[in-house]
């Protein structure tokens, strides 16, 4: 996990914020792609189930941030020992999810620009 954070911080420009115990890196689609290639990174799509079903990044799990129990669901599905990579449609919901996860003690990589930017760089994925 530390190696991932050091690699990202040394190779690309990103926005770094600290909330609670965890750290958040907000990164471009290309850096996000490199990040999720690392073993142990937990990939989370925080959009609605319908949005997720319409297309998602392979390997992601869906935890809808708009539900009233996002934190509880994340706590049962995610391991704090590993970085969590989050994305939504445009980057707004994933920023909120990243803040919540950070406050819970997770280290988070967030896709700035969301799935929309991912599709521009890598095409639509179903």
Each model region followed by its residue ranges:
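Short, surface-exposed ligand- or partner-binding patches at beta-edge/loop junctions that are enriched
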Residues: 87
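Structural scaffold elements adjacent to functional motifs in cytosolic proteins
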Residues: 43-45
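Sec-dependent bacterial lipoprotein signal peptides
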Residues: 1-8
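Rhodanese-like catalytic fold shared by cysteine-dependent sulfurtransferases
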Residues: 9-35, 41, 50-83, 92-126
